[in-house]
Amino acid sequence: MIARALADALARCGHSPHLVITPDYGFGRLTSTYRASWTTDVMTIDGCSIDRVVSLRYPSFAVRHPHHVCWLNHTMREYYDLWPRFAASISWRNRVKESVRRQTLHAVDGWLLHRNVTRVVAQSKTIQQRLAAAFDIRTEVVYPPPPLGSYQCLGYDDFIFAVSRLDPLKRVDLLIRALAELPARHVNAVIAGDGECAGDLQALARSLGVANRVRFLGRVDEPTMLDCLARCRAVCFTPYAEDFGFVTVEAFASRKAVITCRDSGGPTELVVDDGSGVVCEPTAASVAIAVARLVDDRVLAERLGSGGAAQAATMTWDRALEQLLSV
């Protein structure tokens, strides 16, 4: 999504962007994935000479160009900040094998980020801190602005909206559990996205007796997502240690407050508690209090949504491009 938004912004500013998707051969074929990026030709595309390269995620920073800015959104987190969690989930034999792979990956990533790119820019302070800890790289932060979409506010209906991949790190279950803490209130949730936890989340809603108050949309197209953002009371985005989280700025652009958690990483850098959303503890009870405040007080939801919109207005693509292209 960020790559497409960046390409659209470059085109709007008079540049001629080429969006190149580097190969990804999956978790078990990292060597092939890195080699494919290293050998991807970005010097000329369709007969055009390329003046600048902006890479985003691992291992696209392995492509080679003399004017190469890495605007990093994440490395392979299982081998970095999520290593303790990942290591605990595998057998000791696999842990030995993966430890060697992790050390190799750190060495390769460190060399590429120090030697293969002209400049490294982080998409959040959370990423900036990880880069400093892993590679002793000092970076500036350029937050991705909202995509150039049709964001609008069509009201503040009585539902909380959540949109993300449905995997454990996104902690969508916190919203479902929060609804169970609020049986006396007419609070509904709409959840968009798919992933490995989809079935478990639906089963959780049934077991807690809130299945009639949670609507699972599955994976949705952009118009449906924009409509939900435009009409919801607020957005609930409570991941664990998120790199950045585009959902936050999309909610702000729709004049909607964001509920997030103190350990959510990137979103907590943008959400101002009681200014553009609510920052709570990563517990169902704490999320329930935040949901109740916004559902019971529409004026508060509107005020915090306005605060988010004011923040989004300062995050422009013109400014981001000026920072990224100053190689």
Specify the residue positions occupied by each region the protein language model found.
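Aromatic "clamp/platform" in nucleotide-sugar-dependent glycosyltransferases that forms part
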Residues: 240
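Conserved acidic donor-binding segment of nucleotide-sugar-dependent glycosyltransferases
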Residues: 262, 273-285, 293-298
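Active-site donor-binding segments of glycosyltransferases and PAPS-dependent sulfotransferases
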Residues: 13-60
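Membrane-proximal helix-turn-helix segments that form the acceptor-binding/catalytic region
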Residues: 89-120, 128
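Conserved donor-binding/catalytic core segment of Leloir-type glycosyltransferases
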Residues: 150-170, 176-181, 190
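A short, well-ordered alpha-helix in the C-terminal region of glycosyltransferases
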Residues: 213, 293, 300-314, 323
